[in-house]
A protein has these predicted regions:
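Short, structured segments at the rim of ligand-binding sites
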Residues: 1-281
């Protein structure tokens, strides 16, 4: 496919937000450079509302002229220009959650610097889930620290819509909780890099874990995963989540681990640095 750039006209567009917020952010970012204002109407709902809000706030910081309200049903971007700014980037909360979950799972302790609970990244709310499961969390002015427990607590139902990238993380540690955990409101992740609901249910079943699959989520029951070979389906979040199980069960093998390069190329080396025994075949 070849695309030849030309001046953007602007105008009105109607867009769905129920599959991914990324389509909306991708449309908004170039909109200040259109000839006339761009009006984006969301015809249903946004599954990860906070990411669009984060996009808009950064656009404003760099000089864009935008109008929106908190429900983000209508967003207007007026012709304007970005101006250079110096900013300090914080750590990626989505990636940090795998390491927080690792500490939770192994009764360990970890501190993530350059990330606070006050971040606007929605996946930071995974900290609340881990706290609900019994972990001790310290919310510092420049860090998050988590200390695990010997037995994780389950027995709850949770909507993961706003932090849906952590659905697989929670599903991977759920077998080690004392009671079942139900995850809901994440039907949209069936349309991400893989059908993530189907894939994690398939993987947990291969591990010998009882799981119930729903249209918009799943329920994971406590169990003792057995060693097996698991397929990542070329999905970085599948690989990163399933690797956590290997911290508790010897003999977990993962096909195509290189798919983590999309998010965290050094993921397995970082796990090794934290004490996990990883063999690269």
């Amino acid at each position: 496919m070849s695309i030849k750039g030309k001046e953007l006209a602007g105008g009105n567009v109607s867009l769905s937000g129920k599959i991914s917020s990324q389509f909306i952010s991708g449309l908004l970012i170039p909109s200040p450079y259109t000839k006339k204002s761009v009006t984006v109407n969301i015809k249903d709902y946004i599954v990860q509302h906070s990411y669009v809000l984060l996009t808009l706030q950064l656009m404003e910081k760099f000089g864009a002229n935008v109008e929106y309200d908190n429900n983000l049903k209508k967003i207007v971007v007026h012709p304007s220009h970005y101006t250079p700014q110096d900013i300090e980037l914080e750590a990626d909360a989505s990636t940090a959650c795998y390491f927080l979950a690792l500490a939770a799972l192994t009764n360990g302790k970890i501190r993530i610097d350059n990330l606070t609970y006050e971040t606007k990244q929605p996946d930071i709310k995974m900290v609340d889930v881990l706290e609900q499961m019994g972990c001790k969390v310290t919310k510092g002015s420049s860090f998050i620290e988590l200390e695990g427990v010997s037995q994780l607590k389950g027995g709850f139902e949770i909507s993961m819509r706003e932090m849906s990238d952590q659905t697989l993380t929670l599903a991977a540690i759920a077998p080690f909780a004392d009671r079942g955990i139900t995850i809901k409101d994440v039907e949209h992740i069936r349309h991400h890099e893989s059908d993530r609901i189907s894939v994690i249910c398939e993987s947990l079943t291969q591990l010998g874990i009882r799981v119930e699959e729903f249209k918009d989520g799943l329920k994971v029951f406590p169990g003792n995963p057995k060693p097996t070979l698991l397929n990542t389906h070329d999905d970085h979040r599948v690989a990163m989540s399933l690797a956590l199980i290997g911290s508790k069960v010897e003999g977990i093998q993962i096909n195509d681990p290189g798919c983590v390069s999309k998010t965290c190329p050094q993921y397995f080396r970082l796990l090794e640095s934290l004490g996990l025994n990883i063999s690269h075949l």
